[in-house]
Amino acid sequence: MSLRRPSPDGIAPHEYNFKKKRKVAEICQALNTDPIDVAALRRMAISEGGLLTDEIRCKVWPKLLNVKMDDLPPAPGQELREDNEDYQQVLLDVRRSLRRFPPGMPDEQREGLQEELIDIILQVLQRNPQLHYYQGYHDIVVTFLLVVGERLATALVEKLSTHHLRDFMDPTMDNTKHILNYLMLIIDQVNPDLHDFMQSAEVGTIFALSWLITWFGHVLADFRHVVRLYDFFLACHPLMPIYFAAVIVLYREQEVLDCECDMASVHHLLSQIPQDLPYETLISRAGDLFVQFPPSELARKAAQQRAERTAASTFKDFELASAQQRPDTVLRQRIRDRLRVEERTKSILTKPRTNRFVKLAVMGLTVALGAAALAVVKSALEWAPKFELQIFP
Protein backbone atom coordinates (compact mmCIF):
# COMPACT_ATOMS: atom_id res chain seq x y z
CA MET A 1 0.00 0.00 0.00
CA SER A 2 1.57 3.26 -1.08
CA LEU A 3 1.01 6.60 0.61
CA ARG A 4 2.33 8.66 -2.28
CA ARG A 5 -0.39 10.62 -4.05
CA PRO A 6 -0.41 13.79 -6.10
CA SER A 7 -0.56 16.89 -3.93
CA PRO A 8 -3.88 18.75 -4.05
CA ASP A 9 -4.27 21.81 -6.22
CA GLY A 10 -3.43 25.12 -4.60
CA ILE A 11 -6.21 27.14 -3.03
CA ALA A 12 -7.08 30.45 -4.66
CA PRO A 13 -5.80 33.42 -2.60
CA HIS A 14 -9.24 34.84 -1.86
CA GLU A 15 -10.51 31.43 -0.73
CA TYR A 16 -7.45 30.92 1.47
CA ASN A 17 -7.91 34.33 3.09
CA PHE A 18 -11.55 33.55 3.78
CA LYS A 19 -10.68 30.22 5.41
CA LYS A 20 -7.90 31.84 7.41
CA LYS A 21 -10.19 34.59 8.75
CA ARG A 22 -12.82 32.02 9.66
CA LYS A 23 -10.27 29.89 11.47
CA VAL A 24 -8.88 32.86 13.39
CA ALA A 25 -12.43 33.68 14.49
CA GLU A 26 -13.00 30.09 15.65
CA ILE A 27 -9.74 30.11 17.62
CA CYS A 28 -10.65 33.40 19.30
CA GLN A 29 -14.06 32.03 20.17
CA ALA A 30 -12.50 28.93 21.76
CA LEU A 31 -10.08 31.11 23.74
CA ASN A 32 -12.87 33.37 24.98
CA THR A 33 -15.15 30.55 26.07
CA ASP A 34 -15.45 30.04 29.82
CA PRO A 35 -13.94 27.56 30.44
CA ILE A 36 -11.60 27.69 27.47
CA ASP A 37 -12.54 25.14 24.82
CA VAL A 38 -9.24 23.24 24.72
CA ALA A 39 -10.73 20.48 22.58
CA ALA A 40 -11.58 23.03 19.89
CA LEU A 41 -8.08 24.49 20.12
CA ARG A 42 -6.63 21.03 19.58
CA ARG A 43 -8.78 20.59 16.49
CA MET A 44 -7.62 23.95 15.17
CA ALA A 45 -3.96 23.08 15.79
CA ILE A 46 -4.31 19.76 13.97
CA SER A 47 -6.43 20.91 11.04
CA GLU A 48 -4.99 22.32 7.82
CA GLY A 49 -2.71 25.28 8.39
CA GLY A 50 -2.38 24.74 12.12
CA LEU A 51 -2.45 27.83 14.31
CA LEU A 52 -1.51 30.15 11.44
CA THR A 53 0.58 32.80 13.27
CA ASP A 54 3.07 33.08 16.11
CA GLU A 55 0.77 35.58 17.80
CA ILE A 56 -1.91 32.91 18.03
CA ARG A 57 0.63 30.29 19.10
CA CYS A 58 1.61 32.47 22.06
CA LYS A 59 -1.99 32.21 23.25
CA VAL A 60 -2.80 28.62 22.31
CA TRP A 61 0.37 26.64 23.04
CA PRO A 62 0.09 27.31 26.80
CA LYS A 63 -3.52 26.06 26.73
CA LEU A 64 -2.50 22.88 24.90
CA LEU A 65 0.12 22.19 27.58
CA ASN A 66 -2.04 23.41 30.47
CA VAL A 67 0.48 26.08 31.46
CA LYS A 68 -0.94 28.97 33.46
CA MET A 69 0.24 32.39 32.29
CA ASP A 70 0.15 33.81 35.83
CA ASP A 71 2.50 31.13 37.20
CA LEU A 72 5.63 31.46 35.08
CA PRO A 73 9.11 30.59 36.45
CA PRO A 74 11.15 33.51 37.82
CA ALA A 75 14.01 34.95 35.82
CA PRO A 76 17.21 32.94 36.42
CA GLY A 77 20.04 34.30 38.55
CA GLN A 78 23.75 34.36 37.82
CA GLU A 79 24.30 31.28 39.99
CA LEU A 80 22.45 29.16 37.42
CA ARG A 81 25.58 28.53 35.36
CA GLU A 82 27.93 28.01 38.30
CA ASP A 83 28.99 24.42 38.92
CA ASN A 84 26.37 23.13 36.49
CA GLU A 85 27.44 19.78 35.07
CA ASP A 86 25.52 20.33 31.83
CA TYR A 87 26.67 23.87 31.16
CA GLN A 88 29.65 23.11 28.92
CA GLN A 89 27.74 20.68 26.69
CA VAL A 90 24.76 23.01 26.44
CA LEU A 91 27.11 25.88 25.57
CA LEU A 92 28.73 23.86 22.77
CA ASP A 93 25.38 22.79 21.32
CA VAL A 94 23.94 26.30 21.43
CA ARG A 95 27.01 27.76 19.73
CA ARG A 96 26.51 25.26 16.92
CA SER A 97 22.86 26.24 16.48
CA LEU A 98 23.39 29.26 14.21
CA ARG A 99 21.22 27.90 11.41
CA ARG A 100 18.25 27.59 13.74
CA PHE A 101 17.96 31.38 13.89
CA PRO A 102 16.33 33.41 11.11
CA PRO A 103 18.72 34.32 8.29
CA GLY A 104 19.67 37.95 8.34
CA MET A 105 19.15 38.33 12.09
CA PRO A 106 21.75 40.76 13.50
CA ASP A 107 24.58 39.00 15.35
CA GLU A 108 23.93 40.95 18.53
CA GLN A 109 20.28 39.89 18.61
CA ARG A 110 21.14 36.26 17.85
CA GLU A 111 23.82 36.14 20.53
CA GLY A 112 21.34 37.52 23.05
CA LEU A 113 18.84 34.80 22.12
CA GLN A 114 21.54 32.16 22.44
CA GLU A 115 22.23 33.31 26.00
CA GLU A 116 18.51 33.07 26.75
CA LEU A 117 18.46 29.60 25.18
CA ILE A 118 21.21 28.44 27.53
CA ASP A 119 19.36 29.85 30.54
CA ILE A 120 16.08 28.14 29.61
CA ILE A 121 17.74 24.75 29.28
CA LEU A 122 19.74 25.04 32.50
CA GLN A 123 16.76 26.34 34.47
CA VAL A 124 14.52 23.45 33.38
CA LEU A 125 17.23 20.94 34.28
CA GLN A 126 17.90 22.61 37.62
CA ARG A 127 14.22 22.58 38.56
CA ASN A 128 13.84 18.95 37.46
CA PRO A 129 16.93 16.98 38.51
CA GLN A 130 15.33 13.74 37.29
CA LEU A 131 15.74 14.99 33.71
CA HIS A 132 18.94 14.41 31.76
CA TYR A 133 20.08 16.68 28.96
CA TYR A 134 20.54 15.17 25.51
CA GLN A 135 22.05 16.60 22.35
CA GLY A 136 19.16 17.80 20.22
CA TYR A 137 17.12 19.09 23.15
CA HIS A 138 18.24 22.62 22.32
CA ASP A 139 16.66 22.26 18.86
CA ILE A 140 13.27 21.95 20.51
CA VAL A 141 13.88 24.70 23.05
CA VAL A 142 14.99 27.24 20.44
CA THR A 143 11.71 26.81 18.57
CA PHE A 144 9.73 27.81 21.66
CA LEU A 145 12.11 30.66 22.40
CA LEU A 146 11.70 32.15 18.93
CA VAL A 147 7.91 31.90 19.05
CA VAL A 148 6.94 32.87 22.60
CA GLY A 149 9.97 34.48 24.27
CA GLU A 150 12.16 33.40 27.18
CA ARG A 151 9.86 33.29 30.23
CA LEU A 152 6.91 31.59 28.58
CA ALA A 153 9.27 29.27 26.69
CA THR A 154 10.77 28.16 30.01
CA ALA A 155 7.34 27.18 31.34
CA LEU A 156 6.29 25.43 28.13
CA VAL A 157 9.56 23.54 27.77
CA GLU A 158 9.43 22.45 31.40
CA LYS A 159 5.95 21.00 30.96
CA LEU A 160 6.95 19.41 27.66
CA SER A 161 10.09 17.90 29.19
CA THR A 162 8.21 16.24 32.02
CA HIS A 163 5.56 14.85 29.68
CA HIS A 164 6.04 14.58 25.89
CA LEU A 165 9.85 14.45 25.99
CA ARG A 166 10.19 12.53 29.24
CA ASP A 167 11.35 9.27 27.65
CA PHE A 168 14.18 11.04 25.83
CA MET A 169 15.47 12.54 29.09
CA ASP A 170 16.16 9.30 30.93
CA PRO A 171 19.72 8.37 31.95
CA THR A 172 19.79 5.77 29.13
CA MET A 173 18.34 5.61 25.63
CA ASP A 174 16.36 2.44 26.31
CA ASN A 175 12.95 4.12 26.11
CA THR A 176 13.99 6.15 23.09
CA LYS A 177 15.05 3.00 21.25
CA HIS A 178 11.78 1.37 22.26
CA ILE A 179 9.81 4.24 20.69
CA LEU A 180 11.97 4.11 17.57
CA ASN A 181 11.03 0.44 17.20
CA TYR A 182 7.41 1.53 16.71
CA LEU A 183 8.50 3.06 13.40
CA MET A 184 9.06 -0.33 11.77
CA LEU A 185 5.91 -1.74 13.35
CA ILE A 186 3.82 0.98 11.71
CA ILE A 187 5.54 0.53 8.35
CA ASP A 188 4.99 -3.23 8.55
CA GLN A 189 1.26 -2.73 9.13
CA VAL A 190 0.87 -0.38 6.16
CA ASN A 191 3.42 -1.65 3.65
CA PRO A 192 4.92 -5.10 4.42
CA ASP A 193 7.01 -5.08 1.23
CA LEU A 194 8.72 -1.83 2.19
CA HIS A 195 9.23 -3.13 5.72
CA ASP A 196 10.81 -6.34 4.44
CA PHE A 197 13.10 -4.41 2.09
CA MET A 198 14.31 -2.21 4.95
CA GLN A 199 14.81 -5.25 7.14
CA SER A 200 16.83 -6.94 4.41
CA ALA A 201 18.94 -3.80 4.09
CA GLU A 202 19.46 -3.86 7.87
CA VAL A 203 19.02 -0.10 7.92
CA GLY A 204 17.53 -0.05 11.41
CA THR A 205 15.89 3.13 12.70
CA ILE A 206 18.84 5.31 13.67
CA PHE A 207 18.17 7.52 10.63
CA ALA A 208 15.01 8.74 12.39
CA LEU A 209 16.61 9.43 15.78
CA SER A 210 17.19 13.14 15.16
CA TRP A 211 13.67 13.45 13.73
CA LEU A 212 12.16 12.08 16.89
CA ILE A 213 14.20 13.71 19.64
CA THR A 214 14.14 17.19 18.05
CA TRP A 215 10.58 17.01 16.73
CA PHE A 216 12.12 17.49 13.27
CA GLY A 217 13.52 20.88 14.31
CA HIS A 218 17.07 19.78 13.50
CA VAL A 219 16.33 18.51 9.98
CA LEU A 220 13.85 20.99 8.49
CA ALA A 221 15.27 24.18 7.04
CA ASP A 222 12.02 26.16 6.82
CA PHE A 223 10.90 27.43 10.23
CA ARG A 224 7.29 27.57 9.02
CA HIS A 225 7.28 23.81 8.60
CA VAL A 226 8.81 23.32 12.04
CA VAL A 227 6.18 25.36 13.89
CA ARG A 228 3.41 23.75 11.85
CA LEU A 229 4.56 20.35 13.08
CA TYR A 230 4.81 21.68 16.64
CA ASP A 231 1.17 22.79 16.43
CA PHE A 232 0.30 19.23 15.44
CA PHE A 233 2.47 17.45 18.00
CA LEU A 234 1.42 19.67 20.93
CA ALA A 235 -2.22 18.91 20.21
CA CYS A 236 -1.70 15.15 19.96
CA HIS A 237 -0.48 12.09 21.80
CA PRO A 238 3.26 12.19 22.71
CA LEU A 239 3.93 9.36 20.23
CA MET A 240 2.60 11.28 17.23
CA PRO A 241 6.13 12.23 16.04
CA ILE A 242 6.90 8.56 15.40
CA TYR A 243 3.73 8.23 13.32
CA PHE A 244 4.80 11.26 11.31
CA ALA A 245 8.24 9.72 10.84
CA ALA A 246 6.55 6.59 9.51
CA VAL A 247 4.45 8.48 6.95
CA ILE A 248 7.57 10.22 5.64
CA VAL A 249 9.21 6.84 5.01
CA LEU A 250 6.00 5.46 3.50
CA TYR A 251 5.65 8.52 1.27
CA ARG A 252 9.16 7.87 -0.05
CA GLU A 253 8.45 4.20 -0.70
CA GLN A 254 9.52 4.18 -4.35
CA GLU A 255 12.76 6.04 -3.62
CA VAL A 256 13.62 3.49 -0.95
CA LEU A 257 12.79 0.48 -3.13
CA ASP A 258 14.87 1.94 -5.98
CA CYS A 259 17.89 2.03 -3.64
CA GLU A 260 20.54 -0.62 -3.41
CA CYS A 261 19.37 -2.99 -0.70
CA ASP A 262 22.15 -2.23 1.73
CA MET A 263 22.35 -0.31 4.96
CA ALA A 264 24.57 2.53 3.74
CA SER A 265 22.43 3.39 0.69
CA VAL A 266 19.07 3.28 2.45
CA HIS A 267 20.35 5.09 5.54
CA HIS A 268 21.84 7.88 3.40
CA LEU A 269 18.59 8.31 1.47
CA LEU A 270 16.33 8.41 4.51
CA SER A 271 18.65 10.65 6.50
CA GLN A 272 18.09 13.42 3.95
CA ILE A 273 14.53 14.70 4.33
CA PRO A 274 13.21 16.48 1.22
CA GLN A 275 12.28 20.05 2.01
CA ASP A 276 9.29 20.05 -0.34
CA LEU A 277 7.22 17.40 1.42
CA PRO A 278 3.41 17.82 1.33
CA TYR A 279 3.22 18.50 5.06
CA GLU A 280 -0.53 18.93 5.34
CA THR A 281 -1.13 15.64 3.53
CA LEU A 282 1.39 13.83 5.71
CA ILE A 283 -0.07 15.32 8.89
CA SER A 284 -3.51 14.07 7.88
CA ARG A 285 -2.19 10.60 7.14
CA ALA A 286 -0.23 10.43 10.38
CA GLY A 287 -3.49 11.12 12.18
CA ASP A 288 -5.20 8.38 10.19
CA LEU A 289 -2.49 5.87 11.09
CA PHE A 290 -2.74 6.86 14.75
CA VAL A 291 -6.43 5.98 14.71
CA GLN A 292 -5.90 2.81 12.71
CA PHE A 293 -2.92 1.56 14.74
CA PRO A 294 -3.16 3.21 18.18
CA PRO A 295 -0.24 3.15 20.62
CA SER A 296 -1.91 0.41 22.66
CA GLU A 297 -1.84 -1.89 19.63
CA LEU A 298 1.76 -1.00 18.83
CA ALA A 299 2.72 -1.69 22.43
CA ARG A 300 1.02 -5.08 22.25
CA LYS A 301 2.79 -5.98 19.01
CA ALA A 302 6.13 -4.77 20.36
CA ALA A 303 5.66 -6.85 23.52
CA GLN A 304 4.76 -9.85 21.38
CA GLN A 305 7.91 -9.40 19.30
CA ARG A 306 10.06 -9.10 22.41
CA ALA A 307 8.44 -12.20 23.87
CA GLU A 308 9.14 -14.16 20.71
CA ARG A 309 12.82 -13.23 20.99
CA THR A 310 13.24 -14.10 24.66
CA ALA A 311 14.75 -17.32 25.94
CA ALA A 312 11.67 -18.18 27.98
CA SER A 313 9.27 -17.96 25.04
CA THR A 314 11.52 -19.88 22.68
CA PHE A 315 12.28 -22.53 25.27
CA LYS A 316 9.42 -24.81 24.30
CA ASP A 317 10.55 -24.90 20.68
CA PHE A 318 14.11 -25.53 21.77
CA GLU A 319 12.94 -28.09 24.29
CA LEU A 320 10.99 -29.93 21.63
CA ALA A 321 13.92 -29.89 19.21
CA SER A 322 16.26 -31.10 21.93
CA ALA A 323 13.85 -33.80 23.06
CA GLN A 324 13.66 -35.06 19.51
CA GLN A 325 17.45 -35.38 19.54
CA ARG A 326 17.65 -37.30 22.81
CA PRO A 327 19.11 -40.83 22.38
CA ASP A 328 16.00 -42.70 23.51
CA THR A 329 13.73 -40.66 21.22
CA VAL A 330 16.07 -41.01 18.27
CA LEU A 331 16.46 -44.76 18.76
CA ARG A 332 12.73 -45.32 18.99
CA GLN A 333 12.19 -43.29 15.80
CA ARG A 334 14.97 -45.11 13.97
CA ILE A 335 13.65 -48.52 15.02
CA ARG A 336 10.26 -47.57 13.63
CA ASP A 337 11.90 -46.36 10.43
CA ARG A 338 13.94 -49.58 10.15
CA LEU A 339 10.89 -51.78 10.61
CA ARG A 340 9.04 -49.85 7.93
CA VAL A 341 12.00 -50.18 5.58
CA GLU A 342 12.30 -53.90 6.30
CA GLU A 343 8.62 -54.36 5.54
CA ARG A 344 9.05 -52.55 2.24
CA THR A 345 12.20 -54.56 1.50
CA LYS A 346 10.45 -57.83 2.18
CA SER A 347 7.62 -56.80 -0.11
CA ILE A 348 10.02 -55.88 -2.90
CA LEU A 349 12.17 -59.00 -2.51
CA THR A 350 9.19 -61.30 -2.67
CA LYS A 351 8.15 -59.94 -6.04
CA PRO A 352 9.19 -62.41 -8.76
CA ARG A 353 10.54 -59.76 -11.13
CA THR A 354 12.67 -57.91 -8.55
CA ASN A 355 16.22 -57.87 -9.83
CA ARG A 356 19.52 -57.86 -8.00
CA PHE A 357 20.12 -54.14 -8.41
CA VAL A 358 16.88 -53.26 -6.66
CA LYS A 359 17.77 -55.52 -3.74
CA LEU A 360 21.19 -53.89 -3.39
CA ALA A 361 19.69 -50.41 -3.51
CA VAL A 362 17.22 -51.21 -0.76
CA MET A 363 19.89 -52.80 1.41
CA GLY A 364 22.07 -49.72 0.93
CA LEU A 365 19.20 -47.51 2.04
CA THR A 366 18.74 -49.56 5.20
CA VAL A 367 22.44 -49.32 6.05
CA ALA A 368 22.43 -45.57 5.41
CA LEU A 369 19.52 -45.05 7.80
CA GLY A 370 21.34 -47.00 10.44
CA ALA A 371 24.45 -44.85 10.05
CA ALA A 372 22.38 -41.65 10.26
CA ALA A 373 20.76 -42.89 13.45
CA LEU A 374 24.16 -43.46 15.05
CA ALA A 375 25.33 -39.98 14.00
CA VAL A 376 22.25 -38.30 15.51
CA VAL A 377 22.60 -40.25 18.75
CA LYS A 378 26.26 -39.24 19.01
CA SER A 379 25.44 -35.55 18.44
CA ALA A 380 22.66 -35.69 21.01
CA LEU A 381 24.97 -37.16 23.62
CA GLU A 382 27.56 -34.45 22.93
CA TRP A 383 25.43 -31.27 23.12
CA ALA A 384 21.81 -31.82 24.14
CA PRO A 385 21.29 -30.21 27.58
CA LYS A 386 19.60 -32.24 30.25
CA PHE A 387 16.60 -29.99 31.03
CA GLU A 388 14.50 -30.27 34.12
CA LEU A 389 11.40 -30.27 31.96
CA GLN A 390 8.95 -29.86 34.80
CA ILE A 391 10.32 -26.39 35.63
CA PHE A 392 8.85 -24.92 32.43
CA PRO A 393 5.40 -26.51 31.95
Regions found by a protein language model. Give the residues of each.
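Active-site-adjacent structural elements in folded domains
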Residues: 104-110, 121-128, 190-202, 207-215, ...
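Extended, Lys/Glu/Leu-rich amphipathic alpha-helical scaffolds
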Residues: 2, 15-22, 33, 40, ...
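Amphipathic alpha-helical interaction motifs in eukaryotic regulatory proteins
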Residues: 42, 46-47, 57, 61, ...
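N-terminal alpha-helical segment
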Residues: 38, 117, 136-137, 190, ...
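Long, repeat-rich segments with strong aromatic
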Residues: 207-261, 364-371
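N-terminal transition regions in large eukaryotic proteins
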Residues: 1-128, 318-393
